[in-house]
Amino acid sequence: MKVKGMIESDVDTFKVGDVIEVKLADGVKVQAMAVQQEEDGMIFCLVDCLPSEHPMNSTSTNEGGYEESSLRKKLNGEILNLFSAELKAMMAPFNNGDLLRLPTEKEIFGQNYYGECESLCVKQWKPMKKRRNRMAFDGTKYENFQWYWLANKVEDSAFRFVSVNAGGNADYYNVTNSIGIRPTFKIKNH
């Protein structure tokens, strides 16, 4: 008989697949999975969505892409403020200077089905090869599977962004609709 257990320990380094628990300022506890090692740190993505849903933009446009979106500003303001000062001090900024961001379509699926093509350097995160890791609960006590945003605007559309549907498949949604988010952050190497 095999028994699968969970061990809790203090660590300085992480490996892909490790899961950490984070308590947010509003009392919500979330889990984040290590998904990719980079030179300056380990990228983590929330296992499930935050309990609240958000639109990508308040107006029906995807002009400017993720970089110009209302949700990007909210992630690095109001939502970042939910994270503890201790965790924020451990975070390394992404290339654009943000401490929180959304995953991209290629990081989740390994290719761009609906979004504009990403760099050849962007690879699918190893845990996302399993469909179950692409699926996310809604972050509430009801534990419904949730649609969530990705950082890619849909190619040839003026008002859609790529999303992941409840079944863990690539899809898209109108930017003014509210769906889940799985923030991604990077913890510095020690």
Predicted feature locations:
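Collagenous Gly-X-Y triple-helix signature in extracellular proteins
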Residues: 1-190
